[in-house]
Amino acid sequence: MFIKLSSTNSTSIFWLPIFFYNEPYWAQCAISSAELPFYMLSAYVVFVSCRIMLKIQLFHDNLMYIGVPMFGSWFLLIAGKLITILYRVRILNVESVKIHENWVFWTDEPEKMLNVQSLDGLVPLLVAGFLEIHFGFSVIFVGLAIVTERVIASMLIDNYEQSTSLLIPISFIIIYQFLAISISLGILFNILGLYVLNASWILCILIGTIMYYYIRKINTKWLQEMQNPNRKRVFTVSQQFQVRENLGAIAIGKRLVFVVLATIVVMGFGIVALVLEITVLFFMHFGENTLFCYPLYIFLVVMNGHPAWKQEFRKYFPKIKIFKKVRPGLVSVEIVEDQKKKLSLETDTYFRQLKSAWT
């Protein structure tokens, strides 16, 4: 939605990735009440997943310092959504503004914008919009930062795993947060247009894709060389670990890419349908919540990416027994005795062969 602030001296326009649907008040309250349990479950999944990733560190510290805050930034995203819900159910309200009739995603027509004379009562809504924009660009830039960190790790394979310096992760965090905050403010205040919005994430994806294939190619080559018994190069234990670490990160990243792309496709079709007014607004709630509830499927992919994470992740969720426990069937004593005799015979044969080999 757009907010157009008109004063005697100037006019300012703000863009927020927030939707308000023209629905009855009871429907808005009911939908908000239905969304909250899913957000609570998502928060629990995020907390558990971040704790497991820090407890069972499968990757280098630098990668964890860069990646884990990205997953934790979901709490900023949901904070923006909760502020929007407060406006939706009219806990936060502006009497002189019909805020609940603005659902246009992007427009240049002033009559489709929210026209106001002041920002009194709307500052929390601007904060919510900034948090959602900032989250999107943080994910984009931190993804590029993770790939770049793995490229540096591959180039410095001789001693990177032994380094404990925090210079690399701190530098990446400062750079990508500076870019995310700067672009988010530029888009919020409508300084950067739609072309810059699209060009920034498209460029990051292209650069990240090139780096991804570089990392996969060089580390696959090193793995094949390590497994070659006639190799001439000597790989240290730390170097072998780093190669497998890079390939493991690539495997998890590949799964995440497919899931994220599917989410973007669903949300993209929903936004297009909303702009063209070819769908019922009620169904847009489902498309919108594919973003806010993404931990329910993104983190499942991450946690199932490694057996150690998967095993630990299951401990935090109670087992639900749907079916009655099946009683074990009766086994004939004769069959058990035959199996024991067969196992004993094979064991005796093995030791006789071993004894004859030493004599």
From Swiss-Prot:
One of its GO terms (biological process) is sensory perception of chemical stimulus. The gene is sre-26. InterPro entries: 7TM_GPCR_serpentine_rcpt_Sre. The keyword Transmembrane applies. It holds the Pfam family Sre. Keywords: Membrane, Transmembrane, Transmembrane helix. This is Serpentine receptor class epsilon-26. The chain crosses the membrane at residues 29-49, 66-86, 127-147, 172-192, 195-215, 256-276, 282-302. The keyword Manganese does not apply. It comes from the Eukaryota. It is found in: Membrane. It is a multi-pass membrane protein. One of its GO terms (cellular component) is membrane. Belongs to the nematode receptor-like protein sre family. Its main location: membrane.
